């Protein structure tokens, strides 16, 4: 059986975590430290941590790059690392610890919309479709070679929340289909064309306001893109 570790944080990573747990020997889940949330300001675990504990999988919550590298090293030997919306850059020294490599499931058709907010930016741009891409991770931000991708239509009523859910499940299925062939060396990576790259930086709450001087279509896209959050 394929030996794996998983890195992710939000609810959107749960479908992939579920399939990785089902089809591999999942050795470790890495997620962000508990953060203050809600009116109480009490630290709360990430969605991925809660699910990992439910599945009885060991959890690592590193607070530094070195803690991340050390924790991943202690999970060896493992064949593959799978990352979905982890929220931090993984050092190259950690990427080298997998026998085969680290995969990143990204919620766009790379090289379009590299970065932290691809779903919101695809809606803001008025695009009719987007998708998911699995890349082999390298030192860059979403720059690694493409292993697989799948197109998803953006419905006129889609919000970032509804589209994220669709992409999360589409990506999880793509992982199931890809993993055996990847580990056996039967997948030919395809380099991204950097000249075609566009970028999707994180959108701060202050940027999510509405300017009613904008056309109605642009306002509607902003409402959809920032629902349920920027």
Predicted ranges, named:
Residues 1-228:
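One-carbon transfer enzymes
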């Amino acid at each position: 059986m394929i030996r794996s570790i998983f890195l992710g944080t939000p609810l959107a990573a749960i479908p992939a975590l579920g399939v990785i747990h089902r089809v591999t020997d999942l050795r470790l889940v890495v997620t962000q430290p508990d953060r203050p949330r809600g009116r109480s300001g009490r630290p709360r675990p990430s969605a991925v941590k809660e699910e990992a504990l439910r599945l009885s999988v060991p959890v690592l919550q590193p607070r530094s790059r070195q803690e991340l590298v050390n924790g991943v090293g202690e999970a060896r030997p493992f064949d593959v690392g799978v990352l979905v919306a982890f929220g931090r850059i993984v050092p190259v020294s950690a990427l080298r610890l997998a026998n085969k490599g680290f995969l990143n499931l990204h919620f766009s058709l790379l090289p379009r919309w590299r970065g932290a907010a691809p779903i919101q930016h695809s809606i803001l741009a008025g695009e009719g479709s987007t998708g998911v891409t699995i890349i082999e991770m390298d030192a860059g931000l979403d720059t690694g070679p493409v292993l697989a991708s799948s197109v998803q239509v953006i419905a006129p009523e889609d919000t970032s929340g509804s589209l994220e859910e669709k992409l999360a499940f589409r990506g999880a299925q793509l992982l199931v289909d890809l993993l055996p062939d990847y580990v056996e060396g039967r997948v030919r990576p395809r380099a991204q064309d950097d000249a075609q790259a566009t970028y999707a930086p994180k959108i701060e709450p202050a940027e999510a306001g509405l300017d009613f001087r904008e056309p109605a279509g642009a306002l509607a896209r902003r409402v959809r893109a920032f629902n349920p959050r920027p």
